[in-house]
Structures are given as C-alpha cells and as structure tokens.
UniProtKB/Swiss-Prot annotation:
Catalytic activity field: O-phospho-L-seryl-[protein] + H2O = L-seryl-[protein] + phosphate; O-phospho-L-threonyl-[protein] + H2O = L-threonyl-[protein] + phosphate
Cofactor binding summary note: Binds 2 magnesium or manganese ions per subunit.
UniProt domain PPM-type phosphatase: residue ranges: 329-564
Family membership noted in the UniProt record: Belongs to the PP2C family.
SMART domains: PP2C_SIG (SM00331), PP2Cc (SM00332)
Gene3D superfamilies, per the entry: PPM-type phosphatase domain (3.60.40.10)
Residues that hold Mn(2+) 2 according to the record: 358, 488, 555
Coiled coil: none
Organism lineage string: Eukaryota, Viridiplantae, Streptophyta, Embryophyta, Tracheophyta
Protein name from the UniProt record: Probable protein phosphatase 2C BIPP2C1
InterPro entries: PPM-type-like_dom_sf, PPM-type_phosphatase-like_dom, PPTC7
Induction statement: By salicylic acid (SA), benzothiadiazole (BTH), hydrogen peroxide, abscisic acid (ABA), wounding, salt, cold and osmotic stresses.
Residue sites binding Mn(2+) 1 per the record: 358-359
UniProt-recorded Gene Ontology molecular function terms: metal ion binding; protein serine/threonine phosphatase activity
C-alpha cells in the first residue's frame, strides 16, 4: 500500500496533558448514572451523569459503559471527535522523521505519539526505575524496580532484508474471551458469552459437563478489580497476591448467566460456537468490558507414547507420559473500534493448535475493515487444521500458508500460529505478536518481535508468501509449563516479568487459563489508558528519542493462555 495513501486523511491528535508524577493509587470502579433502577452506586466512586454511563456487569440497561479512575480524567478526555493519543487518534506521520534514515516510515494508529520532539538520549536515560504496587483482585502486588534491558519491545530487532510488507499497524478487536475444555475448537472472532465446556473422550462416547455462566456480576467485578497505582510498570518479586487471586477465582465462579453463547455436542466431537454480544451490551466508544470466557482442553496425544531402548541383546519400551494442552483466551477492543468488530482475531483448535492475528488499522483510511483480513487468516488456519485431522501432520507455516492463500479480503496483519504435538511446541511468527513460555515462575523461552523500527512491525499482506517471512520456533515443553500468546496490546503495556509472576501465582491458586487471560487483558487495558505510568511502550519510545513520553498504549488486546498438563485418560 502506498505510504502517501496511508497517510491521507490523518490529522494530528490534540495535545495530551503533560505527564504527571505518580501519586496515590486511584481506585478504579465501574460507574453507573444515579437513579438507574436496579444498579447500585459503587461506594467512593465519582460518577458522571452527563456521560450516560451504565454499569457493564450483570443486567445492564443501555448506554456506554465507562471505566473511570478516581478523578474521572478519562471521561473528561473521552470527548466524541476529539480523541487524544490515549484513545488512539490517527496521527500517522508523527514519527516519520524518526524513520527516514531506515528508508521507510510508519506509525501505529493506536499508539501514535503527538506533541513530542525526537531527541537523542542514552540508554541509561531511556528508562527510570520506579517502585510501584498493583493488585490482583484488590490485593497489592509489590513490584520492585525493573532492571534496564536492551531487549525493549517496539525497538527495531528483526528486519527481513528486501521485504516490504503492508502498512504500519494496529488498533482494535471485538471483545471476547474464550476458554474451552473440548474435543474440537473455539473461535474468538466475535463476542462470546461466558461458558465452560469440559469433555473427556473414551472410545466412542463422550462425557460432557457443561456450565454456562455470564457476564461478571457486580460482585465478580469487585473481585476482578485491579486497584493498581496508575504508575505500575517496573517488575520484580510479587508478594501478598494469594488472597487476591482467590478473590478473582471466586468472582469468576460466581458469575451470572448471559446470552450470546451456543454449545453443541456431537458424540465424540464437541464444538463450541459463540455469537457476538448485542450492540446494547457493548462499549459505545470509551468503556471497558470484562472479557467473557470459555474453555477448551484439547488432548493432543491419544495414547501413551513409547521410546525403544536397546541394551546389548534385548530391547525394551519406555512409556512416556501423555501431555495435553489446556488453552483459554480473552479479548478486549480498542474503544473506538468496537462497533466495527475490532481488528484482532485468534483461534483455538483441538490437538494443540492456536494462534493470534492483529490487523493493520491503516486500511480503514481506504474504507476497508482492517480486521477482516486477520479474521480470515484465523478462520483459514482453523479450517486447515480441522481438514487435516487423520492426515500426516501439517507444519505451522504450512497451515498459515494455506490460510493466507484462501484469504480474500484486502489487508495486512501480524500473525502467530502454534502447535503442541504432545512434547514439542512448534510456532511460526510474523510481526510483533508473540509468546512467552513460563516455567517455574520464570521466562523459559520467548519469541522476538519482528519490526522495521519503532512501532512499525513486519506484516503479511494478501498475496505475500508466508514461507519468506516467518520466523520459526521449536521448544521442548514439560508438564506445568505455561504459554502466553498475545498481540502487542499485551506486551506494549505489561512487562514480561509481571506476566510471569501473574501466571505463577494464578496457577498456584488453581485458576483456569481463561481466568488468567481475563486478568492479563484487563491489566493491559488499564495501563493503556494511563497517561503517566511507565510501560514497555514508553520505554521503547524514550529509547528512540521521544523524550518525555509516558504512559501505556491504548490498543486492542488478545491473550491466549495455554497450560501443559498430564492426560487423565
């Protein structure tokens, strides 16, 4: 796509208020207008009648849901038609001067930087250590200072020589959460009702325990509330979180039922299909929904594997444990993209397959739904996996290539496709979506962002050959390992060490993958809305010369959490 065409129609965003020093933690709450029948005001939470806000949990009446801080700053900034950088105003070209020396220019619509002059800074000036505190479910997360690192997300790390793909990246997604324990697949393209499906397959029969729950009630929201200081960024040891994790688990288990979710059972083949929530239930521009969830546990090995061991004149067989992958996902949209369905997508299919994609928002300036191409990629991957069952196993890059060949919509996207074969994780990646493998509370392996430069990721566009673009990974996994796969909406706002700590504490508390994904998505959204906190994105901006930038990057967020478990079959 011609870069001048991409920049057409873009106007600078209104200047943002200068970054303030981090003060006392602002209590986050879900506001509702006074006088609305059946909705209780949250104690100590300022509400704004003129914003038309309603509670976004339980049986909400109608109108936009608003997640506000104690001083209501987000509401004051969230004026129709006057979006600042916190709300993702298209400001293509702001960093163009910064990228000229690389021979190209690009910007991320959701994270464009405005009113900041590029200057040269040393790496030591690019980041500062802050002592911060956060919470899971209201309990404090005591975070130490984050050591400086040269592996800052958003900075140029992987450049494919001779490749020019698409346009610069990013915006929104439809609000979804999916986690399933199933014998088939789950698809996160549209909004879901919260549910849980567990199926164990033995021979020709299937035993199913199904429970459909709903949007988090006010009690559930209180349990999920992240009373985090606006300036949460540096990461170290995390303490006093067990109680908070327990509260979050209880809140999720006590959720009320919602519509929009359909579950179908077919003997040994169980498929979960969910439709999107209605317009009345969605954010009308600036609110935040707690993601809905559904779960799928997929058995990737149908029996015990054996390894032959030779010893002089005899041969014996050593039985290896059968491992399965339990995966769950959650999504939240960029507030300005809810009504168009968002631009993130993902899929979870049985036999250990999953993936995420992040459509490039710049296509919307040409009248194209930027999320269609990403959704077609994920649909195509799921279709290829389902059609190949019983045939020789396909490689991840082959699945992606088949999906890309069948995609019909114009567009471009970052994409990651992964498969766990019972012992080894195989993954292929294009762009700045990525994964972390967490073992015993530590980051064991991770992918590298593939970018042309700051905030300008590599992308696959319709007609491109994925084999020339992908970066491939093979990682041996063991029982208890966790995989966090996500679009850059997570990694730009939440430090990797914090993600690892959340995974560790959540698994100790027995939370499901979808519940962990929910918390990570809500955490990323919270940091993305802050104009003052330190984040991986602000670190990257400072590192390339945007002196004075602070805060997160408001974006659509998609997270898939997968846990390696021993099969009970």
């Amino acid at each position: 796509m011609d870069e001048e065409a991409r920049a057409a129609g873009c106007s600078p965003a209104p200047p943002r208020a200068p970054a303030a020093s981090c003060g006392a933690a602002a209590e986050l709450c879900l506001c509702s207008p006074t006088g609305v029948e059946g909705i209780e005001q949250v104690p100590g939470c300022p509400c704004f009648e003129d914003a038309g806000a309603v509670v976004v949990s339980g049986e909400a009446p109608e109108g936009p849901g608003v997640l506000c801080s104690g001083d209501g700053a987000e509401l004051k900034l969230a004026e129709q038609g006057a979006l600042d950088v916190r709300l993702g105003s298209p400001a293509v070209g702001i960093h163009e001067q910064q990228l000229l020396h690389r021979g190209t220019s690009g910007s991320d619509e959701a994270g464009a930087i405005n009113e900041i002059s590029p200057v040269e800074v040393s790496p030591s000036e690019a980041s500062s250590n802050l002592d911060t505190a956060g919470a899971i479910g209201g309990s404090p997360l005591m975070l130490e200072s984050l050591p400086e690192t040269s592996d800052t997300r958003g900075c140029e790390q992987e450049v494919m020589p001779g490749v020019v793909v698409g346009s610069s990246n990013r915006d929104a997604s439809s609000e979804v959460g999916v986690e399933s324990e199933c014998g088939s697949d789950a698809d996160g393209r549209n909004g879901l009702g919260e549910g849980e499906l567990v199926s164990s397959v033995d021979g020709g029969g299937a035993e199913k325990s199904s429970k459909v729950t709903g949007v988090l009630s006010e009690e559930g929201v209180d349990g999920m509330e992240t009373a985090l200081e606006p300036c949460v960024a540096s990461v170290g040891s995390i303490t006093q979180v067990e109680e908070g994790v327990d509260r979050m688990e209880t809140s999720l288990d006590d959720s009320e039922a919602s519509d929009g979710s359909t579950t179908q059972d077919f003997d040994t083949d169980v498929e979960t299909e969910s439709s999107g929530s209605s317009i009345e239930e969605q954010d009308m521009g600036y609110g935040v929904h707690i993601p809905h969830t559904e779960q799928a546990i997929c058995e990737v090995a149908r029996g015990n594997k054996s390894s032959e061991v030779k010893s002089s004149d005899r041969m014996s067989s050593v039985t290896l444990p059968t491992l399965i992958l339990a995966s769950g996902a959650a999504m939240l949209p960029h507030p300005s993209k809810v009504l168009t369905g968002g631009e993130d997508a993902y899929f979870i299919a049985c036999d250990g397959w999953f993936g995420v994609a992040d459509g490039v928002g710049q296509w919307s300036f040409e009248g194209i739904n930027a999320g269609l191409y990403a959704r077609e990629l994920m649909d195509g991957c799921k279709k290829a996996v389902m059609e190949s069952q019983g045939a020789p196993e396909m490689r991840t890059e082959e699945v992606l290539a088949k999906a890309a060949d069948e995609a019909r919509s114009p567009g471009s996207s970052t994409v990651l496709v992964a498969h766990f074969d019972g012992q080894v994780l195989h993954a292929c990646n294009i762009g700045d979506s990525g994964f972390l493998v967490i073992r015993n509370g530590e980051i064991y392996q991770k992918s590298k962002p593939m970018t042309y430069g700051f905030n300008f990721p590599l992308q696959i566009e319709k007609g491109d050959d994925p084999f020339k673009l992908v970066q491939k990974y093979t990682i041996d996994l063991q029982e208890g390992d966790a995989i966090v796969t996500a679009t850059d909406g997570l990694f730009d706002n939440v430090y990797e060490e914090e993600i690892a700590a959340v995974i560790s504490k959540s698994l100790e508390a027995g939370l499901k993958p979808s519940e962990i994904a929910e918390f990570l998505v809500a955490r990323a959204k919270e940091v993305g809305r802050s104009a003052t906190c330190r984040s991986p994105f602000s670190d990257a901006a400072l590192a390339v010369g945007y002196l004075g930038y602070s805060g997160g990057k408001l974006d659509d967020v998609t997270v898939v959490v997968s846990v390696v478990r021993k099969s009970e079959v």
